[in-house]
Amino acid sequence: MKKSSDKSPVRQHDTATQINSDAVSSSTSFTDSDSTCSFLTPSMEFPDRISFRRIDFSEAAPTGVVLPSTSSELTRSNSSENKIPNEDISVSTSSRYLVFDKILALMKKSPGRRGDKTSPARRLDRSDAVRRNIDYDAGEDSSSLLITRSLDFPNRTSFRVDGVDDGEIDRIYQYIGVSGPEDFAISSDAWKARMEHERSSSDVVNKLKSLDLDSREAGPSGGVVASSSMNHKFQGHDLSEAGSIGVVVASNFTLSESNKIENLNSLRDKEIVDGDMVENRCGIERKPTILVKSRGYLVHNDDVGVGGGIKGVRPPVLNVPRADKEVVDGGTVESKSGIEWKPTILVKSKGYLVSNDGGIKGVTSPVLNLRPTDKEVVDSGTVENRRGIKGVRPSVLKPPPVMKLPPVDLPGSSWDILTHFAPDSEIVRRPSSSSSSENGCDEEEAEDDKVEKEETGDMFIQLEDTTDEACSFTTNEGDSSSTVSNTSPICVSGGSINTSWQKGQLLRQGSFGSVYEAISEDGDFFAVKEVSLLDQGSQAQECIQQLEGEIALLSQLEHQNILRYRGTDKDGSNLYIFLELVTQGSLLELYRRYQIRDSLISLYTKQILDGLKYLHHKGFIHRDIKCATILVDANGTVKLADFGLAKVSKLNDIKSRKETLFWMAPEVINRKDNDGYRSPADIWSLGCTVLEMCTGQIPYSDLEPVEALFRIRRGTLPEVPDTLSLDARHFILKCLKLNPEERPTATELLNHPFVRRPLPSSGSGSTSPLIRR
């Protein structure tokens, strides 16, 4: 900035004054938002004196920076109070330029000057004020004033939660300024109040819609509703003469002059209170057309006189829809909107529905034909519900016949075998399905008694032999079975036990119970098999009835190689099966005591085939061919025992099922229907039995029962030693064909060389087939 070349005092004075004004205007001062801060500003007067005045900056902006925009703050101190007489400073002409230089330096350092690139001066903050012992009294709302507008809205609008740190959610709450998820919750009281408000508003709208608003220019009245001017406040109307209706509706809800309601949805913005002035939510004042009740009529409020009467012609009564009525028998009914109406009520009088006018007057009202909903109509008569029968009593319908279920052969399936390997507590017994049939053994007695008899799937037998015959056999009689005492066994055929008997010593433990020797009163010895009923559970009675019916049929079989059944008896806890007594025991006991040669094995095999041929021809399947179930008498005659009992799975204990597994055919284990137990299954068991007699060991003797089960299922044959004769090996392998259709029948096997070899001669001349050492 150039200095003026003019040396006159007047020009120098004017120049200094202008420079001083610019310097002061570029100076800065600081204020606090909570208190007023003032400072001394130099007021220069040239050429006389330099004085100072105090300037108040209480009107400063919140930013804390005050920039004087005019030079009015620099005033000449001509008055006596602005001068400082004791501190006057004389300014010479030589020192004036020094002052100007200082002012210019100050102007260059000012941060508010344009084009200045120097760093701004340090800002005065509250910490400096405390150091300088300046008293500072912060107000209660000082913290809120310091927050700028930019801090009201966080600059971060999205957050990512990785789930690694446990404090991520807490930091988000802290960032947005809440303490936790509870700050977002709505209190139950506020929610209930809001719901009550919405419910009351919707009820009012429903009531207004139910009225015929088109026939009249208003609805029900009785309160105050504010409407229809945008520029006026609400005005309340006293409608105490309207009665106890309690509802006021404005008809001109739009800003037009028409009194009709053009938009019922505008009612959602109103809150109607009985007898009080109500303001709508939008704050818009409207002038309603109000209807009031006067002597039973709804009329305009302007037509009601001082005494409550109606001016001019009485208007017609509004037609309120029937849907708003609640009809109560014998009294006046109020509609839902609170308006009293006198409906036509029908009451029941002497069986007729008539008008409730205090009785039937004049012409009797027509009777309504109501359908007798409390009656039940039957083809042969009318039955009145819960009031007894009037008229002809209907006939009782005959129940439909019992549905016959297809017979199912459940015992011996692979599932039953697997479950029997489990402990006793884990075994789940299967219920047997049954259907009705008749007993062919005693048809005349069944016809006389007319008792329905049942056929159980467990007792169904399907066979296939040389004649391809198949038949089913009955079991028990349904409800006609009677309890037999110990002294009166069931008589089924000749040779049965008809007198009392006594149990003797134990002979052996059979597959289905213990076998004892017994004697009758006539001195006849026989064997009795004792089966415990306690082991059969809740289905013991059904199981025993099935077994009794089966034994009744087996008792009719007569063959030298078949063990004869002689009847049954039972008491409270046991079932007794009477059998033919065989003293020498089973083949299992025999080959354990003696060494049996091939010739004797061939003889026993021929007798077994004779017995199987007879059973298959009669329609029976043994199901349990093995050495333990084949008995030998004192003459060396082989007898098949325990046949037929294996069909009743309830009588099979766990031990017998494990032992029977080693002789089972693969189709029996893998079967899915009744085709598993057919005559070829007995042929497979016969081959295992011959192998057992030849080796003195049961088949699959080196395997556990479960492992043997899977071996048989996969079709793995038992080991046949090479030490056996060729005929014996060929006979065994012929019986152990995996395909049941490839196995020969019992009749065909009787022609095999293994069973047709000649019998050895006996030195004693005995005709017994048993060869003694």
UniProtKB/Swiss-Prot annotation:
Region listing for Disordered, in residue ranges: 1-35, 426-455
Reported consequences of knocking out the gene: No visible phenotype. Suppresses the cell death and defense responses not only in mkk1 mkk2 but also in mekk1 and mpk4 mutants. In the triple mutant mekk1 mekk2 mekk3, no apparent phenotype, but meek1-like dwarf phenotype when complemented by MEKK2. The triple mutant mekk1 mekk2 mekk3 is almost insensitive to external glutamate (L-Glu) on root growth.
One GO MF term attached to the UniProt entry: ATP binding
Compositional bias segments (type: Basic and acidic residues): 1-14
Tissues with expression: Expressed at least in rosette leaves (at protein level).
UniProt-reported outcome of changing residue 177 to D: In summ1-9; suppression of impaired plant defense responses in mkk1 mkk2, mekk1 and mpk4 mutants
Binding site for ATP: 507-515, 529
Gene3D superfamilies in the cross-refs: Transferase(Phosphotransferase) domain 1
Effect of residue 611 to S: In summ1-17; suppression of impaired plant defense responses in mkk1 mkk2, mekk1 and mpk4 mutants
Enzyme Commission number(s): 2.7.11.24
BP-aspect Gene Ontology terms: innate immune response; regulation of defense response; response to L-glutamate; root system development
Family recorded in the similarity comment: Belongs to the protein kinase superfamily. STE Ser/Thr protein kinase family. MAP kinase kinase kinase subfamily.
Protein's name according to its UniProt entry: Mitogen-activated protein kinase kinase kinase 9
Gene: MEKK2
